[in-house]
Amino acid sequence: MANAQATEEEIEIVEEGTTAPQVTEPPLPATIAGLAALLEIPLDDCLVPCNFCGKFLSHLEACEFDDKRLSLIWKGHLVYACCRWCCTATATFEFNEFYEHTVTGREIEFVTGKSVFDIDVRCQNCMRYLDSIEKLDICGRRLPFHKVRDSWKGICRLCKHFYNDW
């Protein structure tokens, strides 16, 4: 059994008036895939609780969380994510509480002064980022874009299909 006590040679003595070197921790991962890589475990084995309801995300929900480009929530050294149901509830709450205004179709380009391709738009229902095709579809059909909490919202193809709005 190894001696657990350190000898004087093993202890770095800091002279009076100087400071000990700062130990910097690596940055905490923002994605579930990044967390699994840091822990060197398969993504299937990475169990992360929902910040709102406390249930552990399923493998599919973990993949959706990363696909939506949401960030992990760190409280001390405890990590939380957001399950599918709570993402929808959060999106609905934000829409109802922080709605600012609505533009139709290509009006979003005139209001923002940017091309629709350069505007970040999340789904107002599930919080996914809309891709270029989804944004062009909204513009072409003259459907609404909503400004909510300083961000733009629309409806993604998955939610359109779910709500039969196509």
UniProtKB/Swiss-Prot annotation:
Q: Where in the cell is it found?
A: Host cytoplasm; Host nucleus
* Chain positions of all zinc fingers (unnamed): 50-86, 123-159
The answer on whether this UniProt entry bears the keyword Metal-binding reads yes
Could you list this entry's UniProt keywords, alphabetically sorted: Activator, DNA-binding, Early protein, Host cytoplasm, Host nucleus, Host-virus interaction, Inhibition of host innate immune response by virus, Metal-binding, Modulation of host cell apoptosis by virus, Transcription, Transcription regulation, Viral immunoevasion, Zinc, Zinc-finger
Q: Where is the signal peptide?
A: none
Q: Which domain of life is it from?
A: Viruses
Q: Name one GO cellular component term.
A: host cell cytoplasm
Per the record, the GO terms for biological process are: DNA-templated transcription; regulation of DNA-templated transcription; symbiont-mediated perturbation of host apoptosis; symbiont-mediated perturbation of host ubiquitin-like protein modification; symbiont-mediated suppression of host innate immune response; symbiont-mediated suppression of host type I interferon-mediated signaling pathway
What this chain does, per the entry, is described as:
Plays a major role in the induction and maintenance of cellular transformation. E6 associates with host UBE3A/E6-AP ubiquitin-protein ligase and modulates its activity. Protects host keratinocytes from apoptosis by mediating the degradation of host BAK1. May also inhibit host immune response.
Q: What is known about its subunit structure?
A: Forms homodimers. Interacts with ubiquitin-protein ligase UBE3A/E6-AP; this interaction stimulates UBE3A ubiquitin activity. Interacts with host BAK1.
Query: Its family?
Result: Belongs to the papillomaviridae E6 protein family.
- This chain belongs to the protein called Protein E6
- Organism of origin is Human papillomavirus 19
List the gene name.
E6
